[in-house]
Amino acid sequence: MCVDFSLGELYTNFIQNQIKGFKNLSIILENRLTSKTDIFVSDSVIESLSITQIIWKRPPTPLDWEMFGDAIVDVKNKSKRM
């Protein structure tokens, strides 16, 4: 998973620390997009990106976090089937 917000490194680190709280999901955080990245979390869509993108224009709400968890489960289930 790559996390990158246009609001800067401090905000990106804040979101990354929140994501680290999902310990039971075994999330690997990356500082940049790579061929191994399967989820991109940001405030900007990258049109050419074919992986799951989670876009938050404002601080995430409880519903955003629920959808985040669902997206992780979906990606993990897809990778198990491959």
Can you say where each PLM-predicted feature lies in the sequence?
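C-terminal structured domains
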Residues: 1-82
